[in-house]
Amino acid sequence: MTNIRKSHPLMKIVNNAFIDLPAPSNISSWWNFGSLLGVCLILQILTGLFLAMHYTSDTMTAFSSVTHICRDVNYGWIIRYMHANGASMFFICLYMHVGRGLYYGSYTFLETWNVGVILLFMVMATAFMGYVLPWGQMSFWGATVITNLLSAIPYIGTNLVEWIWGGFSVDKATLTRFFAFHFILPFIITALVMVHLLFLHETGSNNPTGISSDMDKIPFHPYYTIKDILGALLLILALMVLVLFTPDLLGDPDNYTPANPLNTPPHIKPEWYFLFAYAILRSIPNKLGGVLALVLSILILILMPLLHMSKQRSMMFRPLSQCLFWLLVADLLTLTWIGGQPVEHPYIIIGQLASIIYFLLILVLMPVISTIENNLLKW
């Protein structure tokens, strides 16, 4: 009699994805972030569902409904802060996951990589809309500033912005539709995650060497299930330390002031995980140019397979490329810092230089250095 795990139509899918899946024997902890993102997604959907039970998406009551959740709902405060800080953990894992893909050349799995980039855009859109829902000052002004960027699109820009707003300013209609989109998008993301995994399992995982591991595979369970569980426990530990000790560390104090269209906060800035892109946006004096740079700063990931000039897939044996990679990481951290600073003398020029370096590294320096390394291999 065959094992039900291998014969049952549903169990078979789970078995082939998480139990009997042949996995490379040498994948490091950088390969943990995929499963951690799954944990984050489940956590966000669950906490979000419980928050949605008590939240009202109306401009008059949205702010007080969030206050009500924190004060009156049983454990509402912990659910709210787990959801808010869970988003931060989500983005930490996302950026680590993308960084791993760049370092080890995982972008050569074209379908998996492209679905991943679409997922990144969708998670960013979801997080942005979620930030608007508490209807604090930064929620309102963040929504106003970011949606207004679309008015830079020639000819249709103004109509497009008013269509998204559902009126002539960010108001009740905007909040209601943002809540609807914020609720539905995670489920679309979940479906896309399955597509992402489907494409990944067509080829199998990459590994730190970038060399085919077909001759040295081990079953996913128990080796990587136990490794993923350890990773998940550490993630939850980090999240709970954040939630229970410094829940407002990553938030903006302005969001504890109810939204007021007549009073602009001195410094409008998004959540920390968007600051690098915000810095790139602000570093270009022209509105349309800034918007294009903002979109390209993420969309550039799609070009990574085209920009790969090296004969080797991974950066493991390419010290010069490694230097550039870590320079890119440092540059992104610099941009993140600049994005949170006011627009004044030293910060403007630092932001512009960091933005130029960002595009220069990816589009010019990395391919050039890869070509040089190819020539060094001949010596």
From Swiss-Prot:
GO cellular component, one term: mitochondrial inner membrane
GO molecular function, one term: ubiquinol-cytochrome-c reductase activity
GO biological process, one term: mitochondrial electron transport, ubiquinol to cytochrome c
Binding-site residues for heme b b562, renumbered to this chain: H83, H182
Pfam families xref list: Cytochrom_B_C (PF00032), Cytochrome_B (PF00033)
Keywords tagged on the record: Electron transport, Heme, Iron, Membrane, Metal-binding, Mitochondrion, Mitochondrion inner membrane, Respiratory chain, Transmembrane, Transmembrane helix, Transport, Ubiquinone
TM stretches of this protein: 33-53, 77-98, 113-133, 178-198, 226-246, 288-308, 320-340, 347-367
Cofactor: heme b
Electron transport listed as a keyword: yes
Source domain of life: Eukaryota
Cofactor note: Binds 2 heme b groups non-covalently.
Compartment(s) where it occurs, according to its Swiss-Prot or TrEMBL record: Mitochondrion inner membrane
Residue sites binding heme b b566 per the record: H97, H196
Residues that coordinate or bind a ubiquinone: H201
Topology class, membrane: Multi-pass membrane protein
UniProt-listed PANTHER family: CYTOCHROME B
Function, in words: Component of the ubiquinol-cytochrome c reductase complex (complex III or cytochrome b-c1 complex) that is part of the mitochondrial respiratory chain. The b-c1 complex mediates electron transfer from ubiquinol to cytochrome c. Contributes to the generation of a proton gradient across the mitochondrial membrane that is then used for ATP synthesis.
Extra facts: Heme 1 (or BL or b562) is low-potential and absorbs at about 562 nm, and heme 2 (or BH or b566) is high-potential and absorbs at about 566 nm.
Subunit-level organization: The cytochrome bc1 complex contains 11 subunits: 3 respiratory subunits (MT-CYB, CYC1 and UQCRFS1), 2 core proteins (UQCRC1 and UQCRC2) and 6 low-molecular weight proteins (UQCRH/QCR6, UQCRB/QCR7, UQCRQ/QCR8, UQCR10/QCR9, UQCR11/QCR10 and a cleavage product of UQCRFS1). This cytochrome bc1 complex then forms a dimer.
UniProt family annotation: Belongs to the cytochrome b family.
Protein name: Cytochrome b
Native source organism of the sequence: Tragelaphus angasii (Nyala)
